[in-house]
Amino acid sequence: MYRALYRKWRPATFEDVVGQAGITTALKNQILHDKVGHAYIFTGTRGTGKTTCAKIFAKAVNCQSRNGADPCGQCPVCTGIDDGSVMDVVEIDAASNNGVDNIRDLRDETAYTPSVCTYKVYIIDEVHMLSTAAFNALLKIMEEPPSHVIFILATTEIHKVPATILSRCQRYDFTRIAPQDIEGRLLYVAGQEKIELTPDAAGLIARLADGAMRDALSILDTCAGVTNQVDADVVRRMAGD
């Protein structure tokens, strides 16, 4: 089955993450110096790497054969997190699991130690979608978190997250990725995929993506589905210009 480019080329290490050097450096230093916190909040526009960094971090703190601060990607824990068979790393979409009962179930789970990992990691995406009661339940866990639990909250709307939650998290602001960084990544991916992408086309896609790497790769995917020779005219045609 064909895998979309944004999924196939999702960064697997901190080194692969484009345009967020300050954040990846800080996270790597915490791992290397064993100063991992119990709660983080990643905020920024869509497609800037929040969930990707959360997953890399979750693997890195639990990896059995870590390469510096990066996960090896090959050990049973890394592969198990990738394929969903390791239950100690849980990704929750708050948009569809936003009730107090969902968070109470999570709270009950945190009482148990990890089965195969060092840490249980809960990645709560679009956390701003939680109900007021759910936020209150989450706060109760975060006030006295078990030592084996890490929360990584991700949001595109930080202003909707209660101050009581924010004050208990390390905050990292993901910025829109610079067009030149997106352009470079597009040209690299195109080369690996044997797609003939012109620099002008890469630059145009980078501008259309408005700082979101995921969107840029999706546009490239759409264009390459029409022709393997992607120039600026192809991009304009597919973008409806």
Question: Which positions does each model-derived feature cover?
Answer:
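P-loop/Walker A NTP-binding region and its immediately flanking N-terminal helices
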Residues: 1-171
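Extended, largely alpha-helical regulatory/partner-binding modules appended to the mid-to-C-terminal parts
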Residues: 23, 59, 73-76, 80-87, ...
